UniProtKB/Swiss-Prot annotation:
InterPro entries: ATP_F1_dsu/esu_C_sf (IPR036794), ATP_synth_F1_dsu/esu (IPR001469), ATP_synth_F1_dsu/esu_N (IPR020546), ATP_synth_F1_esu_C (IPR020547), ATPsynth_dsu/esu_N (IPR036771)
Organism: Shewanella loihica (strain ATCC BAA-1088 / PV-4)
Record function comment: Produces ATP from ADP in the presence of a proton gradient across the membrane.
Keyword annotations: ATP synthesis, Cell inner membrane, Cell membrane, CF(1), Hydrogen ion transport, Ion transport, Membrane, Transport
Listed GO CC annotations: plasma membrane; proton-transporting ATP synthase complex
Family: Belongs to the ATPase epsilon chain family.
Top-rank taxon: Bacteria
GO molecular function: ATP binding; proton-transporting ATP synthase activity, rotational mechanism
Gene from which the chain derives: atpC
Quaternary structure, from the entry: F-type ATPases have 2 components, CF(1) - the catalytic core - and CF(0) - the membrane proton channel. CF(1) has five subunits: alpha(3), beta(3), gamma(1), delta(1), epsilon(1). CF(0) has three main subunits: a, b and c.
Membrane topology annotation: Peripheral membrane protein
Protein name: ATP synthase epsilon chain
Cellular localisation: Cell inner membrane
Database matches in Pfam families: ATP-synt_DE (PF00401), ATP-synt_DE_N (PF02823)
Amino acid sequence: MAAMTVQLDIVSAESSIFSGLVAHLQVSGAEGDLGVMPGHAPLLTHIKPGMARIVKQDGKEEVFYLSGGILEVQPFSVSVLADVVLRAEEIDEQAAVEAKRRAEAHMANAGADFNYAAAAIELAQAIAQLRVVETIKKNIAR
């Protein structure tokens, strides 16, 4: 018996990052983590900066970092549209650590003209990238 799958397309502002059949997708939605499997109800929602984990048709997993964006679920296809999409192995861990440190410093030393929203977004994106790196390291250690 063939595994049930759904067509998934992950697209960044620059290019198509992934297109193929998947058995499962997990993303960080605006209201919490979302799991999408074949037969999922139609849905359109914002996604937060975080990890997208897919289980492909052959059972292999792949992990991506998404900067946030839109998730659209239709009966036979799922689309993820994000400004920035990185495969887990493309994440520069040191750059993410530095971005996190920088955002925390800006928030701690905020002046009158401080843009809190921009610093919060930078911090959330850096933390999300570091979580993806940690997840990959845990999977490799198994």
